[in-house]
Amino acid sequence: MDHVSHAAQRKFNSLNLLLLPWPTEIKPTDFRVVLEPPHNIAELAKNAVYQEFAPKREDASTFAARVDRALALACEQSGEIHGVVFPECALNVEQYLAVEKVAWRHGVLLIAGVQESGPKWGRNVVIVQPLGLIEKSDKRPNKKGLDSRLETTRLGQYKHHRWCLDRPQILQYELGGRLPASRHCWEFIDIEQRELNFLSLGDWLSWCALVCEDLARQDPTAEIIRSVGPSLVVALPFRARVHRRRAS
């Protein structure tokens, strides 16, 4: 269980989150079949393939400027923002590192779904960065540089389960031109050791974050969450699942 500093705990009795549905558009061409998966895995069943989300990413500095403007506008309208949240796989590593510093400058918590590239597998991670919220309330000097402080407080939690796109989903999301509807299309990510990060804000709020598929699966992780009983669970959905025909 990680704790926000005592100074922050004394100050906050509410939590205002800015939810940014990024990217604003996802196209069928952002998905592709992985033609050459790693050789050290068991042979896929004949009715399954791996699929990868591979969108064209905006330049990190341009994207960070967007987030900076969004936070400034949200503060104008709401008075105070304590955190900003991005969906599953919304950012790549470069975008995340840029936005992390924007969140710190605004003194807010950052929760983001980040897509990492690996030598073989991709990785899907939710990263929580509380440093902005901590240092906004705790003004004590710190001799460490900003990058070092960000690295110290950064909490990463890798996705526990692969997403499987079946025929109904492929057709519903109009991905039939990119993924074979006749086969199960499994998310091309590595499954790391399962971890859960719980955070507390004073004695009134405890919370954790989960990537979308991990909330749906009733496995030992769900039992742990029920045992801890956090007052808030932040679930990061995959933006593509909110298709225009389903939006409400």
What role is predicted for each listed range?
Residues A48-P55, I134-E195:
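Low-complexity, serine/threonine/proline-enriched polar segments
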Residues P21, P130, Q157-H161, V211-E213, ...:
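Short, structured patches in soluble enzyme cores that scaffold and shape functional sites
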Residues I41-L44, W104-I111, S227-V233:
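Structural alpha-beta junctions
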Residues A8-L19, I26-P28, L150-T152, R194-A209:
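Beta-strand-turn-beta hairpins that frame and shape the catalytic cleft
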Residues P28-F31, V93-K101, K120-I127, D219-A222, ...:
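A short acidic (Asp/Glu
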Residues M1-G83, A90:
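N-terminal, active-site-proximal structural segment of metallo-dependent hydrolase catalytic domains
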Residues E58-Y158:
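Cys-nucleophile CN-hydrolase/nitrilase-fold catalytic domain and related Cys-dependent amidase chemistry
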Residues E76-S78, H82-F86, Q172-S248:
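Active-site beta-loop-alpha substructure in enzyme catalytic cores
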